[in-house]
Amino acid sequence: MVLVVVAKDNDDCVWFFDRVSLLLNIVGSSCKRHGMLRHHQYANVMKALECGILESGSGLNQEMGLPRPGDTRWGSHYKTVVNMIAMYPTIHDVLIALGRDTSQRGEWPKIHTMVGVFESFDFIFSAHLMLDILGHTNELSECLQRKDQDILNAMSLVRLAKSKMQQMRSKGWVSFLQRVTIFCNKYGIQVPRMEHNYVPYGRSARFAQDQTNDDHFRREVYIGVIDKISQELDSRFDEVNMELLTCMAALNPADSFASFDANKVHRLAKFYPNDFSSSDLLRLDLQLETFIDDMRKDEMFKGLNNLVDLSVKLVETKRDKVYH
């Protein structure tokens, strides 16, 4: 899934992921720092439990951690953002401790810079935006990465992702900004007034456009990233491709061809007019009845999981010559 790459086409997202990479290198580069992270996390979870913020239960007391910097799989981006927000006070404490540790003096300039970034509205805003976008497309990305792809469920998840992006764009800004503001207020992070001029954090204002914070954060970043994600989804999964993939799913051999649908297979054939004449399409309807009976009765076709398995088995049994 290339949604992270698409998001990185936005300058603020490039800046954000570069800073995340720096954070992972600082916090996760040594066993000593990992030990510090576990200690601070334990203290904060216990404090939260005593305050009733968290509910104790299955999995909630399991230790969370940040993925290694070299873990570049798509899912690691989402996990990183989730844990970074969930563990924000812990990570902040670790950064402050490292910034005061004389044994880390050589790293102080880098650490002190990261503390400033971590306390900036720009960073928190981008983190929450990535949390929402990666979260709303997480199930789709996981589905598309599985070897035994469920095409019908994948297409349903594509439609849901497209719909969610549209909802975020049309009526999600106010609630999103409120959530970011609440988070910032909780941790003492200054929230800029949206009508004031935008001043980029840690970047030269010389290259910044003359615009308000609202123009930048809402129009350029929030809507800009959502539009890029929506365009990528529309490009990869337009109506024709969606119909084609849905029709292909009708030949999925899983569970004794439970998804078989002769009408969808017929529609699939119509996508290839050079290969199927009108007389071929007429014969196809009758041939499909024979095909599905044959597949369900032959033990050699039991236990197949996907179209690749079916194609291999058809060649092995020379059925590809029968149903040509």
Predicted regions and their residues:
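Alpha-helical structural modules in large enzymes and assemblies
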Residues: 1-324
